[in-house]
Amino acid sequence: ALGQGLTQDAARDLGLNVGTPVGAGLIDAHAGGLGTVGAAGPSQGAQSRMAYVFGTSACTMSSSDNEAFVPGVWGPYYSAMVPGLWLSEGGQSAAGEAIAQLVRFHPAYAETLAKAAEAGQHLLEYLLEHIADVVDQPSDAMLLAKDKIVVPEFLGNRAPFADPSAKAIISGLDADVSTESLIGLYVAGITGLGYGLRQILKVQTVAGIDPKLVVISGGAGEHPIVKQLLADAAGIPIAEPSAAEPVLLGSAMLGAVASGVKQSVQQAMTDMSSLGRVYAPSSGDIAQRHLLRFQA
């Protein structure tokens, strides 16, 4: 806890009691990391998991017992997120925004946007509903991309190349102006982000940071099909947290420790969070297709 808790002025302004314990705050991504990677379940332990915050941009956070310098990945920072552990932080400068930019390029964008509005849906919600209607299994959605491959580096590469001058690449376009073609481009964009995540995982493994599970949060990754596509493209299980707002949960954990309800941040992470569904990466033909696209 910080100092003697809330001062008289702060307590009055907030409508709380003087002396209410105050925990040291964290940036939003780090608070989200606390709220996701410590839950009981498969690959338990912050060192065995990567937090992937998938919003307008994306942030990856991996914890390790020892300092590991990873090219193109920020850190390591000691006790920056989990006390006593080293934090390595990567990410993608454009993630959800990259997908939004990508679909705007397609000739069917305006027409499909109007159809989505007529149905009372957000465009991406509309596309995902159509994907669910035409595939037997979520992993099969990658087949809708056909020959389209996307490197969604519209704002450069944050990790693992740390290259602000990197540009996006869209390969495999044809003359198809249908909504189905737009769906294929969208799927190619999601898998492109997954391949970017795979690159980060790969360089971290070489440096000795080898998470076995990615825990995803953020608005851009809420749909089950998106989570499955990312798991398949990155080649690693992806879990969803049970909490709808893990950033707020992580902040609550800090408050619990400051107030003495929990004895340590690690205890709060284990006791106050849990995992939901885990999406296992595909095998067989789908996995081989993703590997070839990643290598391309």
Language-model regions, residue ranges each:
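Glycine/Thr-rich phosphate-binding loops that ligate phosphate moieties of nucleotide
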Residues: 1-5, 9, 23-24, 60-296
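Short beta-strand segments
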Residues: 26-27, 51-57, 151
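Active-site-adjacent loop/helix segments that line or gate small-molecule/cofactor pockets in enzymes
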Residues: 29-30, 55, 293-296
